[in-house]
């Protein structure tokens, strides 16, 4: 499980972000946002951890680590609206996820 989560995190490019839930979904474990946190904690800082945020683009890390995350994201060109990342502009969507969403939209539009 952690290998798939770490692989999904590595795919997030500079200037893009994803929520813990997005990463869990992309790794094939919908609803496993907490496991994404555990995978990040056990990574030894080798992953682009700053690109993973709380729901709605909120930095959840307190104090200095939260400030560091914001600084790193801003240095990658990520824009903030108040305390949150502009998710409309910077949210990363894995190609497979987009395909699944298109299929879901087609199914729901027929009804």
State what each model feature region is:
Residues 1-111:
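Nucleic acid-binding interface residues in structured DNA/RNA-binding domains
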């Amino acid at each position: 499980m952690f290998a798939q989560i770490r692989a999904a995190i590595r795919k997030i490019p500079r200037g893009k972000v994803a929520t813990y839930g997005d990463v869990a979904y992309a790794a094939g474990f919908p609803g496993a946002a907490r496991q994404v946190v555990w995978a990040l904690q056990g990574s030894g800082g080798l992953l682009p951890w700053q690109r993973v945020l709380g729901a709605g683009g909120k930095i959840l890390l307190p104090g200095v680590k939260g400030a560091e995350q914001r600084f790193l994201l801003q240095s990658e060109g990520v824009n903030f609206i108040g305390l949150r990342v502009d998710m409309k502009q910077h949210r990363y969507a894995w190609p497979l996820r987009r395909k699944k969403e298109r299929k879901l939209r087609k199914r729901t539009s027929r009804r």
